[in-house]
């Protein structure tokens, strides 16, 4: 086993560029991570404790050549030549304001808002959608595999060296608590289907902080063995909020996060997690939601998230209920109208920002007309003109920064930088 690199030592990349090793940043099961300098640019170097196989090394070089599928990946950008009985690869350094997700689980770092959590969830799904679209699978997603900016929710996924084509294996099976039950039981090798399971586990943990399968079943086994782990995360895996099986419920005093947050989640999220982590889809991998289906659900949730006009906290509003996330606020939220399209249903209340797309692009905002009560205006915050068709079929052009009143039956064509979305205003 390689003991690592010394500070101020040098390496060569496969293209001949010189790597100057600065300092050790951390280490894990596979290797060490150093800050390094290449041609005046500071980067990160992962150096393997054991020399990877020839197949692994060739695949790493191939991933470097083809480039990252998404900006959300800290993707390999160069590979070193073999030296000291091992090798490594370069990747971008993570910014200082990004923290490993395990820090959130330990409450050392907290999200600034629920909207930031939603942003992280959407970015994760979008990154894996683009990865899988290139015929690749990540194979080893776990709570140490990504970093998040707690203020914005922007997300970076690391450890991308295990990415292999779908159906091929990197030699890394992943952690039993995060890999799909069929992998734990040895029925399949990691692929895009098992990625979707791991992604769903991480999404649940983003929202609820606790692990979806670590309820009473795990608490009653303080000494975890391989056989017990195989049973709890493979043969007899059970979601802590399974609709029919109560044997793995969260334990009071232990799973405070899950018990507190789960009741606050919108029904669409609760129902999706219950279905995706339920017995049927645990056993039938091909039935798992795709990344795009997850994105549609998360965008639906984001549409329903508003600022409570009474307390200023976040609130979920849909046609069935209007619940503020602040337990001290019990004032009902009145929705004046809904801005609806085939894929959006946005509640119109005062001081609400209108966002679309996976990036959460702000296209407009609602304000109360000065000197009035309950008369809302929508402002165009894009650089494009919008077209409004009134109930009397009159067409009105709304310039950037312009306003129009909210009236039932209006049809609105909102143009952003790259698309036009057709909305109808309904009561």
Task: Please annotate each region the language model reported.
Residues 389-427:
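C-terminal boundary/linker segments immediately following FHA domains
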Residues 128, 132-150:
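Catalytic-loop of the protein kinase fold
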Residues 74-120:
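Conserved structural core of kinase catalytic domains
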Residues 34-35, 41-49:
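Glycine-rich ATP phosphate-binding loop
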Residues 195:
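Conserved catalytic-loop aspartate of Hanks-type protein kinases
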Residues 142-181:
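Activation segment/activation loop of eukaryotic-type protein kinase catalytic domains
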Residues 2-39:
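ATP-binding glycine-rich phosphate-binding loop
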Residues 203-270:
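Conserved C-lobe activation region of Hanks-type protein kinase-like domains
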């Amino acid at each position: 086993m390689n003991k690592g690199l010394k500070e101020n030592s040098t390496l060569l990349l496969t293209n001949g560029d010189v790597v100057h090793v600065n300092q050790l940043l951390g280490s894990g099961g596979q290797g060490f991570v150093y800050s390094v300098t290449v041609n005046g640019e500071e980067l990160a170097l992962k150096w393997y404790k054991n020399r990877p196989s020839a197949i692994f090394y060739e695949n790493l070089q191939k991933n470097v050549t083809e480039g990252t599928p998404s900006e959300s990946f800290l993707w390999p950008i160069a590979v070193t030549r073999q030296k000291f009985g091992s090798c490594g690869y370069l990747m971008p350094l993570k910014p200082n304001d990004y923290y490993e997700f395990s820090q959130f689980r330990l409450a050392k770092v907290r999200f600034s808002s629920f909207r930031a959590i939603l942003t992280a969830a959407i970015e994760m799904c979008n990154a894996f959608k683009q990865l899988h679209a290139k015929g690749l699978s990540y194979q080893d997603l776990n709570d140490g595999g990504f970093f998040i900016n707690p203020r914005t929710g922007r997300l970076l996924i690391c450890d991308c060296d295990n990415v292999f084509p779908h159906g091929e294996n990197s030699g890394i099976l992943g952690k039993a608590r995060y890999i799909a039950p069929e992998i734990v039981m040895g029925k399949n090798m990691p692929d895009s289907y098992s990625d979707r399971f791991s992604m769903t586990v991480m999404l649940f943990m983003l929202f609820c902080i606790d692990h979806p399968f670590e309820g009473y079943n795990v608490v009653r086994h303080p000494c975890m063995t391989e056989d017990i782990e195989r049973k709890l995360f493979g043969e007899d895996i059970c979601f802590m909020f399974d609709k029919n099986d109560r044997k793995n419920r969260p334990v009071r005093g232990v799973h405070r996060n899950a018990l507190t947050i789960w009741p606050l989640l919108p029904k669409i999220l609760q129902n999706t997690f219950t279905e995706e982590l339920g017995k049927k889809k645990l056993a039938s991998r091909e039935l798992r939601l795709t990344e795009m289906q997850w994105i549609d659900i998360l965008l639906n949730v984001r549409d329903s998230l508003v600022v409570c006009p009474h307390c200023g906290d976040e609130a979920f509003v849909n046609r069935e209920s209007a619940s503020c996330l602040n337990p001290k606020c019990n004032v009902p939220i009145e929705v004046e109208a809904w801005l609806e399209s085939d894929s959006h249903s946005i509640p119109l209340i005062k001081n609400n920002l209108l966002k679309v797309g996976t990036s959460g692009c702000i296209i407009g905002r609602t304000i109360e007309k000065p000197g009035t009560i309950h008369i809302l205006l929508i402002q165009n915050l894009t650089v494009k003109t919008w077209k409004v068709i009134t109930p009397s079929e009159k067409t009105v052009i709304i310039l950037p920064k312009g306003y129009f009143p909210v009236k039932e039956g209006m049809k609105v064509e909102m143009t952003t930088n790259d698309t036009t979305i057709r909305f109808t205003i309904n009561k």
